[in-house]
Amino acid sequence: MIIGLGNDMIDIRRIEKILIRHSSRFIQRIFTDIEQNKSENFPKRSYAYAKRFAAKEACAKALGTGIAYGVNWRDIGIVNSPSGKPTIKLTNHAQIQLEKLLPSNHDAFIHLSMTDDFPWAQAFVIIEALPRG
C-alpha cells in the first residue's frame, strides 16, 4: 500500500546562483557526503545538486512533515543501488517519521524518480508499505 507520495520541481538556475554565492555553506548544510561526492563528480554539478534537492523536498512531503518537526535536510540521503538506480536512505528524525507511518508488520520501500530538463529539475517519491514475510 502507498503510505506517502511527494513531488518537487526546482529551477536549476536558482541552485546555480546559490552555489556561486554560498557554495560551501549551502552544500554542507543540505547534502550528505555521499551526495556531495556524486554531485561534484558530475559534469554539470548544479543539475546534480538540483535533482537531489528536489528529491529531498519530495521525500519530506511524502513523509508528511516537510523539512520540519525535527526532519533535517541531511536526514534524507539520496543514494544509488549497485545497479545505479537512485533511492533514498533515511536517518535520524526522517527514519523515525517513516516508522510512525508504517503499519505493524510492514516494511517500507522508497521509490524515487529524478529528472532534469533545463531549467527544471524534478523528483517524485513514493513510499510503499509491504507486509513482512
Curated annotation (Swiss-Prot):
A Pfam family the protein falls into: ACPS
Keyword annotations: Cytoplasm, Fatty acid biosynthesis, Fatty acid metabolism, Lipid biosynthesis, Lipid metabolism, Magnesium, Metal-binding, Transferase
HAMAP family named in the record: AcpS
Record's GO cellular component terms: cytoplasm
Catalytic activity: apo-[ACP] + CoA = holo-[ACP] + adenosine 3',5'-bisphosphate + H(+)
This protein's record includes keyword Methyltransferase: no
Physiological role: Transfers the 4'-phosphopantetheine moiety from coenzyme A to a Ser of acyl-carrier-protein.
Cofactors demanded by this protein: Mg(2+)
Subcellular location: Cytoplasm
Enzyme Commission number: 2.7.8.7
TM regions (residue ranges): none
KW Lipid metabolism (keyword) present: yes
Annotated GO MF terms: holo-[acyl-carrier-protein] synthase activity; magnesium ion binding
EC primary class: transferase
Protein name: Holo-[acyl-carrier-protein] synthase
Family to which this protein belongs: Belongs to the P-Pant transferase superfamily. AcpS family.
Binding, Mg(2+): D8, E57
Broad class of the protein's primary localization: cytoplasm
GO BP annotation list: fatty acid biosynthetic process
Gene from which the chain derives: acpS
